Amino acid sequence: MVRYISTRGGGEPRSAASAVIKGIAEDKGLFVPDSIPALPFKPSDMTGRPYKDIAKAIIGAFFDDYTEEEIQACVDGAYDSKFEAEDIVPVVKAGGAYFLELYHGRTAAFKDMALSILPYLMTTAVKKENEAHKIVILTATSGDTGKAALEGFADVPGTEIVVFYPSTGVSEVQKRQMTTQTGANTHVFGIKGNFDDAQTGVKEIFDDAAFNKKVEEAGCRLSSANSINIGRLVPQVAYYVYGYIKLVERGVIKDGDPVNIVVPTGNFGNILASYYASKMGIPVKQFICASNKNKVLTDFINTGTYTTDRQFYVTNSPSMDILISSNLERLLYHLSGDPAEVSSLMEQLAKEGEYTVSEKIRNGMSRLSGGYADEQETLDAIAEIYRRDNYLIDTHTAVAWKVYNDYRERTGDETPALIASTASAYKFAADVASALGMPEEKDGFAYVRALEKKTGVPVPSGLRDLDKKEIRHADVIEKSALRDAVLSSVK
């Protein structure tokens, strides 16, 4: 059985169900599998099979304390008519690559792929573990996770969900998605700060034993819907496996041939899922980690030194406006195999704002390439791929495509590439419209309508008429007031 252990070595190994409920380990580390399971099938044997079949097999391999029937029920509940694409994840050839379109769920972002199933995994885990407390989901968001988590957990019995977002660091559409969220158990707060402030605040709450005791006295237990929760990460592995199978199915590659994987990266969870897919047996030649002007990961990959002592930029790809990439800790654990080393690096980051990794970890990063695109390059990429292929992409996907093109020019590597397309262009309609040379509109919602008229690409139903919905969550709080907000939400 796969057990879940902390990246920092503390606590006892846990079942998947226990790790999903707990969210973060007792020693502040993140849960990782003690071994990564092998692919439970040969990719060529799965061609033509629906996404649900792939997801069931991959999630079941990691979460083997769930019964086959439990995993099937979770998958069936998650990947249904909530997704507007019949095949859940279309794989589209454009711009010299293959785009994994991960944004056809209810909130038009890749977070739906995991956050549609996490509530089912969580409620199943609660039953399996005989958990008597109400589960309070705490989530920090740079824009997309918050809405996807709210949509997933809204009115789920036995749960409350509390979301914190940077009040001035998300797009107009993203903000309206969260502030209009329905559900008696949903609580949304803008904070006066950036995503790192929100994420750090949430982590501090998890680490505060006295505060957790107060929450327990209210009959509740804290958990997370961020990618620090292993229940968020594992479902993401499935779509990289599915993308590989699709390329085999179409004759782009033969089973066993390598691919490159390109991911616009903020908190490092999405690209880490592709690393897990490769450890299972999907042949990956290069992982290409694409950043915006907040290029902390690009610099780390190129130098081995991670430093947060740098200017923070608000960009047109806000979901990557991050300086502290939480999931990188998991990769450091897998590459070092040494929880004491990981613990020491995380301590250095907390105290000094930087760390430098060992030669062993550097050597383990040989298949990881880093690059970045600034805001103008991002807009140019949107215009270029639309001109070339009539293909509409959002700002984050544009960063990935630009960085991939730079990599290909630099290396001459023509290995077929899967690019994670992480959000609908309509979530960032103003910037996309600007890239396409369209006239200015009065607000983000007018840009949505104008962009649909120009391109003929339908607006996702979850974004249509968003500006006409009632605002239900208008609170903006100081970054020091997160604990009070949580307590007010659970009473």
Predicted segments with their positions:
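PLP-dependent amino-acid enzyme catalytic core
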Residues: 1-491
